[in-house]
């Protein structure tokens, strides 16, 4: 059962300092995989064990999930995985800005909380500013992977990412959805959904060479598409 928390609650609006790689990993020079909304962290803990030459960091807004997950991460013999508490839309942008160029090589958002009602748009994890921060931190050719079992959740994520112009799909990837998870390790939610023989909607994007659009224009354009009834009216 998913335990939702409202990311717009006052308690989640304080920016947190996330430690730099040098304070998190035994080999901070290794490439980083960032998993946003990692829940209990089972996926990245398994990935870290299978890929010791990568560093893996999961961020999660539900603190009761973070505490046991990071405790287990700290026991890894490779020193290459951590799970941190934060609101991704408040604290991640500043952290990604401090990373050395090309250090962040993969970002994933897997089965985010299904805020699909119109009035809950601002609670979605993938907001325009976070997407632009991801686009800024990823060098061309690096991966941004998203998946969900709820069409009302994945469709806006795909539309927003495509609207940015900063990402393309791999040339030979299946459309509209990938059949397989490129990470090769399923999340707990993914296992549950597949055991029920229900569909999973997956899209792999790759950062291209397109410059990011100005954030204010991008946010306004997205508002016009995603919630046209409340879009700001240009001055006469």
From Swiss-Prot:
Catalytic reactions of this protein: guanosine(46) in tRNA + S-adenosyl-L-methionine = N(7)-methylguanosine(46) in tRNA + S-adenosyl-L-homocysteine
Keyword Cytoplasm tagged: no
CDD domains for the chain: AdoMet_MTases
Designated name of the protein: tRNA (guanine-N(7)-)-methyltransferase
Annotated keywords: Methyltransferase, S-adenosyl-L-methionine, Transferase, tRNA processing
Residues annotated as binding substrate: 117, 149
Family: Belongs to the class I-like SAM-binding methyltransferase superfamily. TrmB family.
Function: Catalyzes the formation of N(7)-methylguanine at position 46 (m7G46) in tRNA.
GO cellular component labels: tRNA methyltransferase complex
InterPro entries in the record: SAM-dependent_MTases_sf, tRNA_(Gua-N-7)_MeTrfase_Trmb, tRNA_methyltr_TrmB_bact
Pathway noted in the entry: tRNA modification; N(7)-methylguanine-tRNA biosynthesis
HAMAP family: tRNA_methyltr_TrmB (MF_01057)
Annotated residues for binding of S-adenosyl-L-methionine: 35, 60, 87, 113
E.C. numbers: 2.1.1.33
Active-site positions on this chain: 113
Cross-referenced PROSITE patterns: SAM_MT_TRMB
Region (Disordered): 217-236
GO molecular function (one): tRNA (guanine(46)-N7)-methyltransferase activity
Gene that encodes it: trmB
tRNA processing as UniProt keyword: yes
Gene3D superfamilies reported in the protein's UniProt record: Vaccinia Virus protein VP39
